[in-house]
């Protein structure tokens, strides 16, 4: 494959890795390239992003992993986007992700992915942007993944005084406890929405 194809693959991998980032070891394994080639690719991609004023992203190295991030120069616009009131309801994916975080916090994105069986980068970004979820530190060890927890805005939005007010799991021995968590959460969510409409 040529260099441009490698850049495209690298960007896709960095996007998919999200906040967890991508280590050079992962990159060499997935792309079947040497460690030196991986470092060269990362350096060249970093130069493309960081040295180009018309690009909105930069490549960061944090705790031995590489991840895409927005440029600080654009923070004002990102803040406006987050502050713009949105009447849109949360998607099913976002609600499922929120339920998992609420019951299992603090939890990493990869742990949420494992429960849902799909990538949850998008739903987590949505929940963070809406102020329902925030990151609270990182796990120890390789990758240093972010730990996600719910916020006081989450409690307000769902009419809870504290996390102890979350619906209790009726049967922890159920065939699918993860589904049980989500069903209880959605029931509570729907009840709070009905009360708002009255």
From Swiss-Prot:
Participates in chromosomal partition during cell division. May act via the formation of a condensin-like complex containing Smc and ScpA that pull DNA away from mid-cell into both cell halves. Residues 167-198 are annotated as: Disordered. GO terms for biological process: cell division; chromosome separation; DNA replication. Its main location: cytoplasm. The keyword Membrane does not apply. This is Segregation and condensation protein B. It comes from Listeria welshimeri serovar 6b (strain ATCC 35897 / DSM 20650 / CCUG 15529 / CIP 8149 / NCTC 11857 / SLCC 5334 / V8). The keyword Hydrolase does not apply. One of its GO terms (cellular component) is cytoplasm.
């Amino acid at each position: 494959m040529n260099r441009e194809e490698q850049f495209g693959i690298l960007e896709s991998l960095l996007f998919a890795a999200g906040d967890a980032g991508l280590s050079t070891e992962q990159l060499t394994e997935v792309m079947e390239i040497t460690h030196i080639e991986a470092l060269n690719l990362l350096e060249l991609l970093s130069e493309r992003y960081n040295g180009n004023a018309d690009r909105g992203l930069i490549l960061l190295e944090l705790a031995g992993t590489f991840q895409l991030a927005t440029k600080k120069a654009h923070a004002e616009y990102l803040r406006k986007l987050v502050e713009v009131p949105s009447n849109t309801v949360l998607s099913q994916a976002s609600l499922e992700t929120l339920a998992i975080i609420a019951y299992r916090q603090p939890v990493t994105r990869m742990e949420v992915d494992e429960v849902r069986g799909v990538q949850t980068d998008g739903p987590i970004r949505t929940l963070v942007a809406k102020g329902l979820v925030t990151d609270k530190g990182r796990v120890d060890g390789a990758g240093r993944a972010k730990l996600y927890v719910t916020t006081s805005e989450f409690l307000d939005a769902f009419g809870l005084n504290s996390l102890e007010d979350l619906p209790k799991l009726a049967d922890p021995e159920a065939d699918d406890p993860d589904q049980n968590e989500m069903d209880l959460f959605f029931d509570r969510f729907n009840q709070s929405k009905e009360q708002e409409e009255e």
